[in-house]
Structure formats: structure tokens, C-alpha cells
């Protein structure tokens, strides 16, 4: 008889008076009923040939082979093809570099002198799209005075419609750099194409990868070759594991300075632009050591939703906020409806500061 007991997430297998901790079992192979001894041995050999140890558990209704060792690079289908195997289940997460189990301490990412993670909040503010030097300069000055420590602005804009404003491109990037020199805020902007990797690596302090490119694996691999930190937004339909695995692509390619950004997921609800998944913060805090910030602007798509969602995100333990701020949102070329005016952003940060103090953080 197989018995499993759960206590504080620690499971034990009891079999033939031998106790194996659940944490030692990294993959479980469930065999089909009435599998012969010969076939059990064959499957065990398949496992050991991959450099793993096995632990056989015989139950009244099923037989299970527990795989002990590093299974992160092993495809379960290698075992599923055997005629005696019913199913294979991973117990060990397939990501390693991003895994808190291998890196218990929270990571703190330095963005040109601004630390994201730990006790200080990363506060990213600015317009959805760069429209002019004067526009970005005014917003940056006011946002910095309110407490923002990074400047965002879209130079290249991924739009659903090919007829929508696509951004100023390299001209917009030059404007951001000029405002950075004037105001002193490090800049954050989205990279869409590998052809701009070199110029972004030279000029951008925090390179943003948008939701649409979260699983652009060729691009993620290239980002691993850069020495700039990466802000990785969650895809519209991405699970937690898929999101972390995308971060793992960047880290496995050589760049471990990755910040995760929750920006809402697509659900059945159509009243809001997306649904902000705030429970991702404690979940990811448990699964990974990477910093987690929240973008409440893109989540709701409405400016009046930004304030309550931003405060809720900080209360839930987010390491920062990415908020769209515009001096004239009614005339904005992109996403004006979800942008805060500078005075509203200033009022919001005063409240955020109070919440941050309660949870041991500061602006």
C-alpha cells in the first residue's frame, strides 16, 4: 500500500520500511496495472541510463518509480513512449537558475544605480509613447519630483492594428537619452527586434520585453548575451511556469539580471482591458528569487483603476510599479485612457509610501 502524507509541503513515501523524502523524488513514473517484473526492470534501466537513481513503490492498485536526481533537462516523453508507462509527472520544476530552491535569497537588480528588489521600490513612470522631447522632459521632471526613480517611454510600439501609431523608433530613443541627460533618470523602453540589440545595449538602462515577445525564444537567447538588466513582462495567456521559463532562457544564456513584470492576463471579463493577477506576487515569491513589479496601467486600461491596483500590488509585496504618466492624456497618441496625470501620480505615490512603510519597504 502506498501512503502519502503532507505536512508543510513535505511529503514522504512509505514503502517496505524505507522512507524517501518527497524532496528527493524529482520525477514520478506511474506504470500501467499488471506490469510484469521484466517490464518494471526495463523502465528502471531507462531511468538509470539517464544518470538518475530509482525508488520503486508497489501499491495495491499501481506501481510507481520515483526518479531521484536532476531531471530538469530530461524530457518526460523519453519514458512515456514505453508501453508499460501510464504517465510521467515532474516534481522538480524545469527551471534552475530562476528557482528559489537554488537561490534562497531575494535577488536585487541594479539598474544604473537604482536597486529593484529588497527594501526599496522600483518606481517606473512615463508616457506610453515618446511623442516629443518637450513632452517627455515635462513628464520626467514631474514624475521624478514625485518619487519616480526610472523613466519609461515607448520608442518602438507593438500595436494590434498596423494602422495605429507605431512609435518614433530610433528618434524616440534619442529623445529618451536626451531627457535622461537632462533629468538624471535611467530609462526603460521596449525592444521588439534583434536588429536593435546593440543600440539598446549601449543606450538603454533597463530593456523591456513586452507580453507579445515573452516567448520569442530566439530573442530571449540574444538578451542573454547583453550586460543590461531585462524587464520581462508576462504574456497574455502565460502560466507562472511558462513565464519563469522565459526568464530562464535569458539567464541560461548568460544574463541573470531579470525582473518580472505582471501586466494583466486575458480572461473572460471584457469590461477591463486585462485582469490583474495579484496573487502571482506571493506565488512567484515562493517559486523564484527574481524581483517582481506590477504594471497596473496595462492591466485595467482605465486610469481610475490604476490607483487601487497599484496600492494593492504594493500591499501584496511587489518590488515596484510601472505606471503610465502623461501631461495631456486626452491628446496622447497611445493609451491615454490608462495614463495618470502628473498630479494624480504624485498623490498616488504619497499613499504608496505609507503602504510601503507598513510592509518594510520605502520609496
Q: Which residues does each predicted region cover?
A:
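Hydrophobic faces of well-ordered beta-strands that scaffold small-molecule active sites
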Residues: 122-127, 151-153, 187-189, 207-209, ...
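Catalytic alpha/beta core domains of metabolic enzymes, predominantly
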Residues: 226-325
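Alpha-helix-loop-beta-strand connector modules within alpha/beta enzyme cores
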Residues: 166-188, 223-229, 280-292, 338-360
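Active-site mouth loops of central-metabolism enzymes
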Residues: 121-138, 162-166, 188-190, 211, ...
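Active-site-adjacent beta->alpha loops and helix N-cap segments on the catalytic face
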Residues: 101-105, 161-174, 195-196, 211-227, ...
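Non-catalytic terminal accessory/regulatory regions of metabolic enzymes
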Residues: 3, 10-123
